[in-house]
């Protein structure tokens, strides 16, 4: 009932629920935006189910460029949560942003290439 009572706000939830919990949110119309977070396969499955109900998704924080690629592949994705944590520094080419949008790279595969020198630095004691 919260969604109906708060027409001025979108209820975005479900980040820590599994597929069955997200399905219950969607089928009961208890959410305005479903937060998908977890494996790529489950995220895509939830997004397809949400699309069947006309409900958009937001993608929870997903490591490096994998989340950018996943969000770009989901037409129903409204938002991508991206915390520019230290792991983004480990990439040869970190995720780029323009005007608040994450840019999906056009490199093959998931696009992540690690900087081996930086990995070695953090693997060393005190790194």
Language model feature labels by segment:
Residues 120-127:
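Active-site microenvironment of metallo-dependent hydrolases
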Residues 106-108, 118:
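C-terminal beta-strand edge segments of enzyme domains
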Residues 103-105, 114:
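Active-site or pore-adjacent capping/gating segments
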Residues 1-101, 108:
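Shared catalytic-loop signature of beta/alpha-barrel
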Residues 84, 118-120:
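Low-complexity, compositionally biased segments
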């Amino acid at each position: 009932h919260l969604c109906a009572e708060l027409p001025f706000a979108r209820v975005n939830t479900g980040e820590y629920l599994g597929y069955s919990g997200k399905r219950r949110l969607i089928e009961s119309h208890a959410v305005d935006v479903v937060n998908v977070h977890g494996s790529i396969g489950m995220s895509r499955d939830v997004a397809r189910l949400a699309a069947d109900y006309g409900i958009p998704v937001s993608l929870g924080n997903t490591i490096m460029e994998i989340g950018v690629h996943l969000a770009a592949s989901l037409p129903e994705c409204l938002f991508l949560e991206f915390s520019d944590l230290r792991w983004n520094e480990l990439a040869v080419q970190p995720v780029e942003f323009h005007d608040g949008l994450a840019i999906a790279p056009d490199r093959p595969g998931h696009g992540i290439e690690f900087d081996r020198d930086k990995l070695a630095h953090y693997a060393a004691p005190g790194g």
